[in-house]
């Protein structure tokens, strides 16, 4: 796992791209809980998202799960690969399975997220 990733308690990860944008996906732990992903309901580019609010839905053979925005901003790119290959979330949760890229409205929100070590400790306690 990339140690530069930040995590929300709701199991989303955030990668700071260094240009005012972040990439968002769901963690390895989350995809393991979901099981085989069969569909991802992607938002539209230019949609505004608010930290803590649902912006996407991932359906698996076990359940449908809302995906929550770990930070606020405007969606600038969606991972269209997920439309035909939703299983990328299972196979590469931190690489090809990313969900959206967002232009942050407030970069300080990143400080509210856990680092990789804190996140791993929290899921091991579950």
Curated annotation (Swiss-Prot):
NCBIfam families: gcvH (TIGR00527), PRK01202.1 (NF002270). The modification N6-lipoyllysine is found at residue 62. Its cofactor is (R)-lipoate. Keywords: Lipoyl. Belongs to the GcvH family. Pfam families: GCV_H. It comes from Vibrio atlanticus (strain LGP32). One of its GO terms (biological process) is glycine decarboxylation via glycine cleavage system. The glycine cleavage system is composed of four proteins: P, T, L and H. Gene3D superfamilies: 2.40.50.100. HAMAP family: GcvH (MF_00272). This is Glycine cleavage system H protein. InterPro entries: Biotin_lipoyl, GCV_H, GCV_H/Fam206, GCV_H_sub, Single_hybrid_motif. One of its GO terms (cellular component) is cytosol. Binds 1 lipoyl cofactor covalently. The glycine cleavage system catalyzes the degradation of glycine. The H protein shuttles the methylamine group of glycine from the P protein to the T protein. Residues 21-103 form the Lipoyl-binding domain.
